[in-house]
Amino acid sequence: MAAPVVTAPGRALLRAGAGRLLRGGVQELLRPRHEGNAPDLACNFSLSQNRGTVIVERWWKVPLAGEGRKPRLHRRHRVYKLVEDTKHRPKENLELILTQSVENVGVRGDLVSVKKSLGRNRLLPQGLAVYASPENKKLFEEEKLLRQEGKLEKIQTKAGEATVKFLKSCRLEVGMKNNVKWELNPEIVARHFFKNLGVVVAPHTLKLPEEPITRWGEYWCEVTVNGLDTVRVPMSVVNFEKPKTKRYKYWLAQQAAKAMAPTSPQI
């Protein structure tokens, strides 16, 4: 009895399976979220890379033919010389358009230039980006216009995501005097954000506890970034210490140097 012959799937079968996978999985990831009765945006992104072009010209020029006649081509007229090969031109980076927010890369709709290894091994297979073809650029421009009109859900910017990540690792210290009666308000907290952490925070984006803060202790404050993400930052209210001037620090350094200098014995 002859052994059964197992044949490997052909290119057509593999192409059909890949097409079903893209239609079922990746295309769903590329679809933006809408608000209310917003019009649906056609998100049939092009998932194929632009093919290069090879430009050639004839080595021997074809002589002009008579009116109404076709030019006579000989064997030498089928010899071509290469002018430009855009298909095999070396490219350092890969231009992609992000379909989702990617840490340290960008947000949806950003045109980024990344290494080929990052684009082909992570961004493209996971549906996080598509090739920056003219068709995809046009689709994202239409999506950007709809987002500006408020017909699509807002997304956080790259700077906003970096701010949120930074605030999650911060702790704010607010110094208040002990010789006057005081109550902490958003304006004071916003000034200390800029003074101590270097972050510009508008007072209307801050939220403090409902009970008035009139004593030293451990509290919290919430910061809303671009009206989308809210971060709770630990806050310590401590006694205010006046910063020492440069002159005072110089005098302290001189006193310390004198104390460390060896004294000569008296005769």
From Swiss-Prot:
Family annotation (InterPro entries): MRP-L9_N, Ribosomal_bL9, Ribosomal_bL9/RNase_H1_N, Ribosomal_bL9_N, Ribosomal_bL9_N_sf, Ribosomal_bL9m_C
Range of the transit peptide: 1-52
SUPFAM superfamilies for this protein: L9 N-domain-like (SSF55658)
Localization: Mitochondrion
Entry keywords, A to Z: Mitochondrion, Ribonucleoprotein, Ribosomal protein, Transit peptide
Keyword check for Zinc-finger: no
GO molecular function: RNA binding; structural constituent of ribosome
Pfam families: bL9m_N (PF25131), Ribosomal_bL9m_C (PF22078), Ribosomal_L9_N (PF01281)
Listed GO CC annotations: mitochondrial inner membrane; mitochondrial large ribosomal subunit; mitochondrial ribosome; mitochondrion
UniProt GO BP: mitochondrial translation; translation
Protein family (similarity comment): Belongs to the bacterial ribosomal protein bL9 family.
Quaternary structure, from the entry: Component of the mitochondrial large ribosomal subunit (mt-LSU). Mature mammalian 55S mitochondrial ribosomes consist of a small (28S) and a large (39S) subunit. The 28S small subunit contains a 12S ribosomal RNA (12S mt-rRNA) and 30 different proteins. The 39S large subunit contains a 16S rRNA (16S mt-rRNA), a copy of mitochondrial valine transfer RNA (mt-tRNA(Val)), which plays an integral structural role, and 52 different proteins.
Name assigned to this protein: Large ribosomal subunit protein bL9m
